[in-house]
Amino acid sequence: MSSYQQKQPFTPPPQPQQHQVKQPCQPPPQDTFVPITKDPCHPNVPSPGNTNIAEQGYVKIPEQGSIKVPDTGYTKIPDSGNTKVPESGCTSVPGSGYSVVPQPGYTKVPDQGYTKVPESGCTSVPGSGYSVVPQPGYTKVPESGCTSVPGPGYPTVPQPGYTKVPESGCTSVPGSGYSVIPQPSYTKVPESGCTSVPGPGYPTVPQPGYTKVQEPNPSIVTPGLSQKKTK
């Protein structure tokens, strides 16, 4: 066995370090360079449902039909040439300290102290002790079919310049203790067919300047004379 080992030639193992050191000295191969292309990226095109958060200093122009509701105490200074046309039927509820300048044709509903015009067929029945004191120059024209039934103790004191024009077919039935005190220059002209039935204790005190127009050809029938003629 020893003789066999001595006959084999000794071959040293290859040194890889020396081979690696020699590689930089060799010239690089002359091959065509092919760049590696990646998938196209589109960062500026938002996908559906993407939310874009604007950075500081970004100006966004609102589209047509955008509605902006200012907070309380918010002051908005419109630019020059800015025109806002409200749509028909638009209702604006201003906040505290907000000024509204109505446009031509604007209708404003007045607050307390406005004048109310009663409709036809109105019936006014005042209670006991109810006083109506009209102002100077006040004219009351009752409509057709209006019935006024004053209660007991109802005083009517017309002011100077007060004119009352009763309509045809108006019936006034005063209660007990009803007093009518006309003022100077008060003129009462009864219409045709007007019936006045005074109650018991009804005094009529005409004042100076009071004019009473009687109907033509009044007929007075006493019960005593008619019974004697029939006998």
From Swiss-Prot:
Q: Does the keyword Phosphoprotein apply?
A: no
Chain spans, region Disordered: 1-104, 188-231
Q: In which tissues is it expressed?
A: Suprabasal layers of the squamous epithelia of esophagus, tongue and oral mucosa.
UniProtKB keywords: Acetylation, Cytoplasm, Keratinization, Repeat
For this chain, the annotated S-S bridges are: none
List localization entries: Cytoplasm
The chain residues annotated with the modification N-acetylserine are: S2
Would I find Repeat among this entry's keywords? Answer: yes
Matching entries from Pfam families are given as: Cornifin
Q: Quote a single Gene Ontology cellular component term.
A: cytoplasm
Q: Where are the sequence repeats?
A: 55-62, 63-70, 71-78, 79-86, 87-94, 95-102, 103-110, 111-118, 119-126, 127-134, 135-142, 143-150, 151-158, 159-166, 167-174, 175-182, 183-190, 191-198, 199-206, 207-214, 215-222
Q: What does this protein do?
A: Can serve as a substrate in transglutaminase-catalyzed cross linking reactions and can function as a cross-linked envelope precursor.
User: Which family is this protein grouped under?
Assistant: Belongs to the cornifin (SPRR) family.
Q: Specify the protein name.
A: Small proline-rich protein 3
Question: What gene is this protein a product of?
Answer: SPRR3
